[in-house]
């Protein structure tokens, strides 16, 4: 799998997820074998205005390479300037967000709003492509109706403008994450495109990932929500791709990851911010496990790393997991 000049080791990609795919989490995904990790979506205006909070979203470490930075905005000139800053930061790939359907983003003419404004989208892609040399990708949805016409049109425009790959989540902008992802849209786009197509949506297991690759013939799979509490899904997918036996769930390892995620988040964000953030993140790791409800309640008000680790260890012990 290759995106422009960047060669990926395999066909697995971590989706950009707001509030989730920060540096500590990306490192977990990379450790599990993910070939390409993506930042949270980064505001082009925030970068150009040198917002420290926005700039920090691009923090990176060599071991997570290659890294894709996703930017969003609606002004071609601002997006071009932001793209230049991303390239200067050392990112390997720039991704443009055409899929976010959050009301605030759409209201400002960015994200999925651009799927209804193909001329603006074209100007934006051209300006970014002209501003940088590193590979450029786009991530989009089906559009504002289920036919896929808007996605096919924008993909054709993007390819003509020099985009190196397209990632698609085949739900409409109004669906958000409701209903089912229509994988037939991915298959149809793959037939039309002459550049790599990355499939995203409803990959809840390694089997789902293989099914998507086989049914749509997409070049790679992008995994988002299912990786939040289970980053080892990438190693499970890789095993299936290689025809190997899928690694069995290992609770000891699962809890080791939880503990490390907590510790690395404290190192990166500081104890107060990390504890507040991890109250919800740790719940994803507890999903489907016995006593998860009790654990969720126990971490609702954690305020120190020591307290958090005690709760995690107590949860582990309640499941009779060996230390």
Placement of each model-derived feature along the sequence:
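Active-site beta-loop-alpha junctions enriched in small/polar residues
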Residues: 17-19, 42-44, 72-74, 99-101, ...
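Alpha/beta catalytic cores of nucleotide-metabolism and tRNA/nucleoside-modifying enzymes
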Residues: 4, 8, 12, 18, ...
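Glycine-rich, positively charged N-terminal anion/phosphate-binding segment
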Residues: 2, 17-92
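Short hydrophobic/aromatic-enriched beta-strand-loop microsegments
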Residues: 37-39, 93-96, 219-223
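Aromatic- and acidic-residue-enriched carbohydrate-binding clefts of CAZyme catalytic domains
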Residues: 115
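Alpha/beta enzyme core
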Residues: 80-94, 98-110, 119-195
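N-terminal small/glycine-rich loop or linker at the start of catalytic domains
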Residues: 1-13, 45-67, 100, 105-108, ...
């Amino acid at each position: 799998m290759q995106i422009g000049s960047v060669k990926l080791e395999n066909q697995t990609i971590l989706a950009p997820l707001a509030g989730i795919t920060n540096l500590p989490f990306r490192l977990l995904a990379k450790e599990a074998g993910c070939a390409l990790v993506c930042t949270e979506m980064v505001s082009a205006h925030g970068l150009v205005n040198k917002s420290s909070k926005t700039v920090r979203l691009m923090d990176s470490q060599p071991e997570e390479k290659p890294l894709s930075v996703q930017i969003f905005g609606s002004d071609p000139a601002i997006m071009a300037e932001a793209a230049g800053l991303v390239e200067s930061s050392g990112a390997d790939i720039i991704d443009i967000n055409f899929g976010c359907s959050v009301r605030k983003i759409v209201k400002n003419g960015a994200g999925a709003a651009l799927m209804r404004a193909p001329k603006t989208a074209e100007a934006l892609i051209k300006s970014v492509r002209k501003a940088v040399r590193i590979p450029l990708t786009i991530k989009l949805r089906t559009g504002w109706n289920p036919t896929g016409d808007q996605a096919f049109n924008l993909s054709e425009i993007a390819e003509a403008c020099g985009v190196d790959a397209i990632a698609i989540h085949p739900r409409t902008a109004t669906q958000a994450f409701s209903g089912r992802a229509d994988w037939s849209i991915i298959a149809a786009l793959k037939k039309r495109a002459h550049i790599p197509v990355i499939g995203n949506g409803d990959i809840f297991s390694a089997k789902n990932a293989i099914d998507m690759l086989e049914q749509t013939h997409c070049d790679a799979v992008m995994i988002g929500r299912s990786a939040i509490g289970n980053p080892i899904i990438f190693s499970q997918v890789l095993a299936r791709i290689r025809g190997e036996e899928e690694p069995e769930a290992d609770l000891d390892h699962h809890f080791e990851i939880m503990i490390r995620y907590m510790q690395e988040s404290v190192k990166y964000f500081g104890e107060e911010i990390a504890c507040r953030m991890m109250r919800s993140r740790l719940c994803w790791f507890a999903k489907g496990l016995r006593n998860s409800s009790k654990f969720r309640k126990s971490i609702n008000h954690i305020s120190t790393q020591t307290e958090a680790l005690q709760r995690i260890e107590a949860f582990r012990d309640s499941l009779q997991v060996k230390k």
